[in-house]
Amino acid sequence: MNPQATDPIDDSASTESAVSRKAKAKPGQRRMEILQAFAAMLEQPMAERVTTAALAKRLGVSEAALYRQFASKAQMLDALITFTEDSLLGLAAKVGEPGADGVDGRAACGQIVWLALQFAQANPGMVRVLVGDALVFEQARLTERVALLFEKLEAVLRAHWRHWASQQGLATPTADAQVRAALLLIYLRGVLHAFVRSDWKQLPTQGADAHLEALLG
């Protein structure tokens, strides 16, 4: 999401400038401001659980103002997960369709994981969502959504590797693809956890070239 500094949402009508900003702000812009602030709070080292009260305070608005844009905190997290899923699967799609002409499945797997690592490095707040830190004490379905996201990403890796293994004439391309995709996902998730646990000091892309070369064989 690359949260950037934005003018806070102003829920007060006490000044003319506040009223002017409020009048100009569109619902979509307000929702984005809220999500950017949420992500920025998640980026803080040793970040505590983000509450709607803390989020409202950061934005300089009332909690009621937040709930006019999102029905619940869970809905905000849903939006962050959607952003992350669209981004990761979108990046994977840019590598090319599995089995498409000119697409090297083995190389594609490495590129997809590399792009995911780059995304994580640029969006540390989203990494807290992916590793589950931001979902502690939240609705179980949110954790299930993240699990499904990883399943989708693994399926893309599996498809790429299966096509490559078939082209190489390997005896068990499907089984090989299952193992390789699982290993790549384990690596990716491990790197994300290390990024969080190090308070963003252990960068996801650090040493990734050598790691991926070893994993891809």
What annotation goes with each model-predicted range?
Residues 41-50, 70:
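Short helix/strand-capping hinge loops at secondary-structure junctions
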Residues 120-144, 193:
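Amphipathic alpha-helical segments used for helix-helix packing
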Residues 1-29, 96, 168:
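N-terminal intrinsically disordered/low-complexity leader segments
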Residues 29-40, 44, 54-58, 75-98, ...:
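Alpha-helical structural segments
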Residues 31, 47-49, 64, 73-74:
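A short, glycine- and basic residue-enriched loop/turn
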Residues 17-21, 49-51, 59, 73:
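Short glycine/proline-centered loop/turn elements that form peptide/ligand docking sites
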Residues 2, 127, 143, 147, ...:
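Hydrophobic/aromatic-rich alpha-helical bundle segments in the mid-to-C-terminal region
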Residues 60-70:
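Short hydrophobic/aromatic patch on the recognition helix
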